[in-house]
């Protein structure tokens, strides 16, 4: 059975087993086809609409291992886990044996030995997950894994909640004009979103300081626009990115010296003038946290075209669907 929501997007109201995603792990949007994304969004909408949560046949223990700071993602995953009936075991990196030199594989091996079957991990190293999902010869770790962000690599749960927010608004992706603005080089959100939006048929544009734009990497996914004012009136979605000062080290250190908050806001920030230039049905998004007065003028964060709070709300249900996909993929708790 299907129904139509207030914004005319067709959503599922019944538990359709044939459309459920099943994955051994969820680490990158590169795992997903366009159909996979739509099925995941349908499932997330099912949960958002109050759909019945599948009953587990036995307790499933999980843990959230965040080696980088997080408010939205960490809390959202824990809410999602508890809604699904999982037993959440606390993990604090600052009080773990990681500080004694234990590597991530051995930390996960410890968790698996204690009966934990699912880990949600955020880690500063790009593609940290490879040592967990592709054990070396002689290693036997079995662990369900959801990637909550790896360095500047991937952020699949943020990408999926962004897709849900866009889909709820427009009912499709094909031909939508979406501009991603800001610290592109250092953004895992930009990478995940440009890949999946390309798969879904959207027209992607990029803007931001040229020292944060790598044409070799980004140009195959969209068009770089130097002056965002040239495109703003045509956009369906304006997606702002946080300036990630904590990643401006090493080879990126020189960009921190070039950066000026006032200049950035003048060139790329969402102010009242640019807000008024947007179409009436355009929406503004941001993965958070927001640097108010830099990427987004503070008095516009909750303006009518903003979907910032909606994104965060959708995140719980998307993460429920992602976790369920891994539970089913690994046949945990009687789910298949």
From Swiss-Prot:
Carbamoyl phosphate binds at residues 72-73, 122, 155, 158, 288-289. One of its GO terms (molecular function) is amino acid binding. Keywords: Pyrimidine biosynthesis, Transferase. This is Aspartate carbamoyltransferase catalytic subunit. Belongs to the aspartate/ornithine carbamoyltransferase superfamily. ATCase family. The gene is pyrB. It comes from the Bacteria. One of its GO terms (biological process) is 'de novo' pyrimidine nucleobase biosynthetic process. Pfam families: OTCace, OTCace_N. Catalyzes the condensation of carbamoyl phosphate and aspartate to form carbamoyl aspartate and inorganic phosphate, the committed step in the de novo pyrimidine nucleotide biosynthesis pathway. Heterododecamer (2C3:3R2) of six catalytic PyrB chains organized as two trimers (C3), and six regulatory PyrI chains organized as three dimers (R2). One of its GO terms (cellular component) is cytosol. SUPFAM superfamilies: Aspartate/ornithine carbamoyltransferase. Pathway: Pyrimidine metabolism; UMP biosynthesis via de novo pathway; (S)-dihydroorotate from bicarbonate: step 2/3. It catalyses: carbamoyl phosphate + L-aspartate = N-carbamoyl-L-aspartate + phosphate + H(+). Its EC number is 2.1.3.2. The keyword DNA repair does not apply. L-aspartate binds at residues 100, 188, 242.
């Amino acid at each position: 059975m299907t129904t139509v929501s207030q914004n005319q997007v067709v959503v599922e109201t019944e538990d359709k087993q044939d459309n459920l995603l099943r994955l051994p792990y969820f680490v990158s949007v590169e795992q997903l086809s366009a159909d996979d994304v739509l099925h995941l969004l349908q499932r997330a909408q099912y949960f958002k609409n109050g759909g019945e949560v599948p009953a587990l046949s036995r307790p499933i223990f999980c843990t959230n291992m965040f080696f980088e700071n997080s408010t939205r993602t960490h809390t959202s995953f824990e809410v999602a886990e508890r809604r699904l009936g999982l037993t959440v075991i606390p993990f604090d990196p600052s009080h773990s044996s990681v500080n004694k030199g234990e590597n991530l594989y051995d930390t996960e091996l410890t968790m698996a030995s204690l009966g934990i079957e699912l880990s949600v991990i955020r880690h500063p190293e790009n593609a940290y997950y490879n040592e967990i999902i592709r054990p070396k010869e002689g290693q036997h770790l079995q662990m369900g894994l959801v990637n909550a962000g790896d360095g500047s690599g991937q952020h699949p749960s943020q990408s999926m909640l962004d897709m849900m927010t866009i889909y709820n608004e427009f009912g499709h992706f094909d031909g939508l004009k979406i501009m991603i603005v800001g610290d592109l080089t250092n953004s895992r959100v930009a990478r995940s979103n440009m890949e999946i939006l390309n798969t879904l048929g959207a027209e992607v544009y990029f803007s931001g300081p040229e020292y944060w734009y790598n044409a070799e990497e980004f140009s195959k996914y969209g068009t770089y626009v130097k002056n965002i004012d040239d495109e703003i009136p045509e956009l369906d979605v304006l997606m702002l990115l946080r300036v990630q000062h904590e990643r401006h080290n090493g080879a990126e250190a020189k960009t921190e010296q070039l950066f000026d908050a006032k200049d950035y806001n003048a060139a790329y920030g969402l102010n009242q003038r640019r807000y008024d230039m947007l179409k009436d049905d355009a929406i503004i998004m941001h993965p958070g946290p927001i640097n108010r007065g830099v990427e987004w003028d503070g008095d516009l964060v909750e303006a009518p075209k903003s979907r910032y709070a909606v994104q965060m709300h959708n995140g719980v249900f998307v993460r429920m669907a992602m976790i369920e996909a891994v539970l089913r993929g690994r046949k945990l708790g009687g789910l298949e």
